[in-house]
Amino acid sequence: MKVFDYEDIQLIPAKCIVRSRTECDPTVVLGEHRFKLPVVPANMQTIINEEIAEKLAEDGYFYIMHRFEPERRMDFVKKMKDKGLISSISVGVKDDEYALIDQLAEENLTPDYITIDVAHGHAQSVIDMIHYIKEKLPAAFVIAGNVGTQEGVRELENAGADATKVGIGPGKVCITKIKTGFGTGGWQLSALRWCAKVARKPLIADGGIRTHGDIAKSIRFGATMVMIGSLFAGHIESPGETKVEDGVKYKEYFGSASQYQKGEAKNVEGKKIWIHQRGHLRDTLQAMREDLQSSISYAGGRDLEAIRKVDYVIVKNSIFNGDVL
């Protein structure tokens, strides 16, 4: 199988049919809701917190709350429901997580979205959790992952997952490929394309996004939604520590399998980096919206479906020619 990644692909323009890119509609439907953009900030502790989740929901964006403060999830779901906002949480597969599902069911609290968040999602433990959630909270939209193969997509969909997350270790602060020799790092876009050939339900591309153009490429190769970490890290509102060096502010960004997340140096598959503090999150979201509208106009359409139909070329690591933003 020939493989490629984001930097190897250039999408080919089609005849433009709009007078202005502002006519282009970058919204997307996932489950029973329509969202302003086909992007979701990674459910990582230095990317999202309750305040950011609430603001995203208020403004019409999709979010997935992380699972690293497990005792707060019940209250979070209650709060979001009381405010009339979508509730979207993450769970793992350990015994305590089953107890959370039981508690939600007992209190008649069904989150709109539940993401089963496991590094190697093609696992019996994930399938068992899908079955359990669907039994106890049948109305919840279940996202399961992460996987990197057609077999993984098939099994999770057959178990009842409503969407599958694709990507094993391509993220900027993930070192799975280095530590284990496994993953989709370096061929994430090909893995997405491969998985999309068998998927009957939405796919969420997770990891490896370095530019806004990569969002359009993900849509072209089968993603309904694109999960992004590094581009959403380092904002003024971002959780995590801030440091100042030579008058420049930096924000920390670490992987969910890093020792900074785990609190111990055991089974580490993530690292920490410091990112130049950016502006506000709303400005990044607006820039993504404008760039995606431009992508749609280059695709010759008015909405995201146009991007799925464009041709492409493989140019092997040469398209940027050293250019940077």
Swiss-Prot record:
SUPFAM superfamilies: Inosine monophosphate dehydrogenase (IMPDH). PROSITE patterns: IMP_DH_GMP_RED. GO terms for cellular component: cytosol; GMP reductase complex. GO terms for biological process: purine nucleotide metabolic process. Its EC number is 1.7.1.7. Gene3D superfamilies: Aldolase class I. Keywords: NADP, Oxidoreductase. It is an enzyme of class 1 (oxidoreductase). Coiled coil: none annotated. It holds the Pfam family IMPDH. The active site is at C174 (thioimidate intermediate). NADP(+) binds at residues 203-226. It catalyses: IMP + NH4(+) + NADP(+) = GMP + NADPH + 2 H(+). InterPro entries: Aldolase_TIM (IPR013785), GMP_reductase (IPR050139), GuaC_type_2 (IPR005994), IMP_DH/GMP_Rdtase_CS (IPR015875), IMP_DH_GMPRt (IPR001093). Transmembrane segments: none annotated. GO terms for molecular function: GMP reductase activity. The keyword Hydrolase does not apply. It comes from the Bacteria. NCBIfam families: GMP_reduct_2 (TIGR01306), PRK05458.1 (NF003966). Catalyzes the irreversible NADPH-dependent deamination of GMP to IMP. It functions in the conversion of nucleobase, nucleoside and nucleotide derivatives of G to A nucleotides, and in maintaining the intracellular balance of A and G nucleotides. Belongs to the IMPDH/GMPR family. GuaC type 2 subfamily. This is GMP reductase. The gene is guaC.
